[in-house]
C-alpha cells in the first residue's frame, strides 16, 4: 500500500509522515531529503562543472532504504544529516528539482523503493505525478506565518528573520506551482487538510479512519 503526503514547505509533512508510518508500521520515505541530497552533491566543487547527464550516470551520492531502516542519504561513504537542512542546499534543491532529467531520475528511484513494502511517501508531487494511483493521498496546507515559525525551528538560531523566511516560502510556493515539470498541485482524490491550528495527533485522528483496514 502507498500513502502520499504532499504540500508546500512548513505544513508539517515530515512530522505527519513519520508519525503515520510509525502508527501503521509502514516504511517512510522523505523525497525532499532525496532532492536535497542531489543538491548538496552538486554544490561540491568537484561536481559543479560536470555535465548533468554524467553527474546522474555516476552519482557521488547514494541512498539506503529497507524494511529495517528509513531512508538514509550518503555522499561517498559519509552519512548526510544536518548538511541537508542548510538554507543554501534547500534553495538550490528548489532550482535543481526543476530539471526534467533530475525529476525523471528521482521518480525512478522512488518507484523502486515502493516495491520494498507498504510505504508513506512525502513530497510535492507524490500523489499527482509519481504515485497517481496511491490508495490514500493527503495534501497539507497551512498559513504562511505558521509555516515560517515551523521552519525557523529547523534552522540555526538567527539564520533568518521570520518575515524574510515567510517571503522565501511564498516565493518557493509560486515557483513550485508555476514550474513546467511536475508542478505542485492538489492531487485528484486527495484529502486536503489545513494544519495551521492542528496538532499531529489531531491530523492523525482525521486520517486514520479514512484508511481501509484491509489495505494495512
From Swiss-Prot:
Catalysed reactions listed for this entry: CMP + ATP = CDP + ADP; dCMP + ATP = dCDP + ADP
Cross-referenced InterPro entries: Cytidylate_kin, Cytidylate_kinase_dom, P-loop_NTPase
Location within or outside the cell: Cytoplasm
GO cellular component, one term: cytoplasm
Gene Ontology biological-process entries: pyrimidine nucleotide metabolic process
EC number(s) recorded for this UniProt protein: 2.7.4.25
Official protein name in the record: Cytidylate kinase
GO molecular function term, any single one: CMP kinase activity
Keyword Coiled coil assigned: no
Record key words, sorted: ATP-binding, Cytoplasm, Kinase, Nucleotide-binding, Transferase
Family: Belongs to the cytidylate kinase family. Type 1 subfamily.
Domain of life: Bacteria
Pfam families associated with the record: Cytidylate_kin
Gene name linked to the record: cmk
Listed Gene3D superfamilies: P-loop containing nucleotide triphosphate hydrolases
Entry binding sites for ATP: 7-15
Amino acid at each position: 500500500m502507498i500513502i502520499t503526503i504532499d504540500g508546500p514547505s512548513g505544513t508539517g509533512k515530515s512530522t505527519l509522515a513519520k508519525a503515520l508510518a510509525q502508527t501503521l508500521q509502514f516504511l517512510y520515505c522523505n523525497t525532499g531529503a532525496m532532492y536535497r541530497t542531489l543538491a548538496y552533491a552538486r554544490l561540491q566543487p568537484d561536481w559543479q562543472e560536470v555535465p548533468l547527464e554524467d553527474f546522474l550516470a555516476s552519482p557521488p551520492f547514494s541512498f539506503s532504504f529497507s524494511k529495517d531502516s528509513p531512508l538514509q542519504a550518503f555522499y561517498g561513504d559519509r552519512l548526510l544529516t544536518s548538511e541537508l537542512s542548510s538554507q543554501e542546499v534547500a534553495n538550490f534543491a528548489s532550482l535543481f528539482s526543476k530539471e526534467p532529467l533530475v525529476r525523471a531520475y528521482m521518480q525512478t528511484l522512488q518507484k523502486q523503493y515502493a516495491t520494498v513494502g507498504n510505504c508513506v511517501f512525502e513530497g510535492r508531487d507524490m500523489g499527482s505525478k509519481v504515485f497517481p494511483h496511491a490508495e490514500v493521498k493527503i495534501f497539507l496546507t497551512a498559513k504562511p506565518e505558521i509555516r515560517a515559525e515551523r521552519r525557523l525551528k529547523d534552522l540555526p538560531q538567527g539564520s533568518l528573520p521570520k518575515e524574510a523566511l515567510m517571503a522565501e516560502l511564498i516565493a518557493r510556493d509560486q515557483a513550485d506551482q508555476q514550474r513546467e515539470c511536475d508542478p505542485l498541485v492538489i492531487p485528484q482524490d486527495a484529502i486536503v487538510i489545513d494544519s495551521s491550528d492542528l496538532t499531529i495527533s489531531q491530523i492523525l485522528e482525521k486520517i486514520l479512519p479514512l484508511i481501509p483496514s484491509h489495505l494495512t
